[in-house]
Amino acid sequence: MTEEIGFELERQQESWFGSWLRWCPTSLSLLREAEKMLLSNLKSLYRGRYVNVGCTVGTEDSHIWTLSFNEESPKIPLVLLHGFGSGVGLWCLNYDALAAKRPIYAIDIVGFGRSSRPQFTRDPLEAEREFITTIEAWREKMNLEKFILLGHSFGGFLAASYAIKHPERISHLILADPWGFPERPLDVGRNSTIPLWVRAIGAILQPFNPLFIVRTAGPWGPKLLQKARPDLIRKFSGVVKDSEEVIPNYLYHCNAQNPTGESAFHALMAGFGWAKYPMIHRMDSLRKEVPITLIYGSRSWVDRDPGFQIKYTRQESYVDVVVIKGAGHHVYADRAEVFNELVNYIGDNVDNGTLPKKMSMNPDLVEGEEARNAGVTLTNMLNVRNDNMQDVTQATVEDTDNPEESEKDAV
């Protein structure tokens, strides 16, 4: 059940499409319907609304599409930033569990999803500043003093950048398989964790926006996504009804529109897997009082060495690195139950004014090569919880036997 506000903005923005609609069968109305289908399985009440953040990018006011859950709770809020090419809908496996604990706010990052799509500057540092300025303007409008900030992939990159700029707002920074942290290697091909087919496609498409092929496919775009990403569809199949249609339909309508956020991402990237200005070189600017948890999937293509580097260089700060065994890049969906338990555990400690016990209790698993290559379970973390969580502590996660899953999970 939901309350949604601000449809008139979507009708105004749809004037952009014009003749484009003759080839790409999309609109903000269709995106709204696709999102509603994706969220129809939720048990939690939520409110969807547009938040006017003023002129933070371009020459006109931007409006940020926002979902909020459990706003009446006095607990510390959790703010969710999605990854590249995504939107608020893909957190659908997490909302119910997380909203049971505290207020949840999820936004479509400016330039993506149902939010405004203004023209960003092509300068990478200035484009990043525009993203961060918009997030801060949204925070001010929402009257959030302090919160837990969780970002996935590109959202993790932006979350880290925001925390560096506004550390006083962050109760805990959670980075889920964050993009853009490592330095691009001189020899990209050698020892790269990014699958060869992704690197090949990335080289061919380097001059273009990453998802232009979805728009080029026109009316065949949803089918293209359905064929290209069956692995992503499977992640949601146990919860989302008709996921084989709903997931690609949602992703298509998220990405078949004016790709301004995508263009800004393209300006920031140095090849698909790297940022022109890697975040690893900037984390020493983050105030030491800000606690950080980095969550990786053991089968993800994202390089997790920067997470361990951050842990070892911020000796005076709380930093924990957790690798969820069997999860890929979409760690929040691959092992949703474990991911939700981990985030709730962190949140409980924030509420109590304590730092979480390190989830990586066993140094043989976490600090050695075994942890870097195979991942760790969350048994030690979950054992500190109440006895009524005993059934969860027994459910340690096993690695998948299908090597293709980590490759398909690359984008």
Predicted regions: what is each one?
Residues 1-78, 100-102, 119-132, 144, ...:
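Alpha/beta-hydrolase fold catalytic core
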Residues 2-46, 74, 125-133, 140-141, ...:
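Flexible "cap/lid" subdomain of the alpha/beta-hydrolase fold that forms the substrate-access gate
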Residues 62-120, 142, 152-158, 165:
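Conserved HGGG/HGGXW glycine-rich cap/lid loop of the alpha/beta-hydrolase fold
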Residues 76, 83, 87, 104, ...:
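Short amphipathic alpha-helical molecular recognition features
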Residues 85, 109-113, 180, 300-301, ...:
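Alpha/beta-hydrolase active-site loop signature
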Residues 94, 162, 342-346:
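Hydrophobic residues on the short alpha-helix immediately C-terminal to a glycine-rich phosphate/catalytic loop
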Residues 302, 321, 327-341:
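Catalytic histidine-centered segment of alpha/beta-hydrolase-like enzymes
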